[in-house]
UniProtKB/Swiss-Prot annotation:
Gene Ontology annotations for the cellular component aspect, listed alphabetically: host cell cytoplasm; host cell nucleus
One Pfam family, short name: Nanovirus_C8
Localisation: Host nucleus; Host cytoplasm
Family: Belongs to the nanoviridae nuclear shuttle protein family.
Domain of life of the source: Viruses
Record-given protein name: Putative nuclear shuttle protein
Natural source organism: Banana bunchy top virus (isolate Autralia)
Function field: Putative nuclear shuttle protein.
Keyword terms: Host cytoplasm, Host nucleus
Length: 154
């Protein structure tokens, strides 16, 4: 069977930063991309086809130039987290008011697993993080959704 004829599945996660910290370690959230093995009767291969991130956020203040990057990283086979998607965000506020930004990005991964035994979950660890380039702080917030597209071949 070709991957195009295989079962399609999505895995969606939400990440919410009520305020962006000046400490980058506080701006990381871990999300797993999972295909459950429960109820499966035969071995399967899993293809992580793509990862898409969509987000919006806001900031407040007067004469503020805000810039940052949203990173989506995936755990590589050697155990290290490596970025696969980097999306810039930001804006400039002239008056003492609230300002909004939004963005999205998508990457085609095509990461295939070996055969996974029935009843065993397949997963890939991912990390969503924010990098502060300029003025991202407690006056900024961001909400993000990450959608992983999977193909399952039995």
């Amino acid at each position: 069977m070709d991957w195009a004829e295989s079962q399609f599945k999505t895995c969606t996660h939400g990440c919410d930063w009520k305020k962006i910290s000046s400490d980058s370690a506080d701006n990381r959230q871990y999300v797993p991309c999972v295909d459950s093995g429960a109820g499966r009767k035969s071995p399967r291969k899993v293809l992580l086809r793509s990862i898409e991130a969509v987000f919006n956020g806001s900031f407040s203040g007067n004469n503020r130039n805000v810039r940052g990057f949203l990173y989506v990283s995936i755990r590589d086979d050697d155990g290290e987290m490596r970025p696969v998607l980097i999306v810039p965000f930001g804006g400039y506020g002239y008056h003492n008011d609230f300002y909004y930004f939004e963005g999205k990005g998508k990457v085609e991964c095509d990461i295939s697993s070996d055969y996974v035994a029935p009843g065993i979950d397949w997963s890939r660890d991912m990390e969503v993080s924010i990098s502060n380039s300029n003025n991202c702080n407690e006056l900024c917030d961001l909400k993000c959704y990450v959608v992983c597209s999977l193909r399952i071949k039995e």
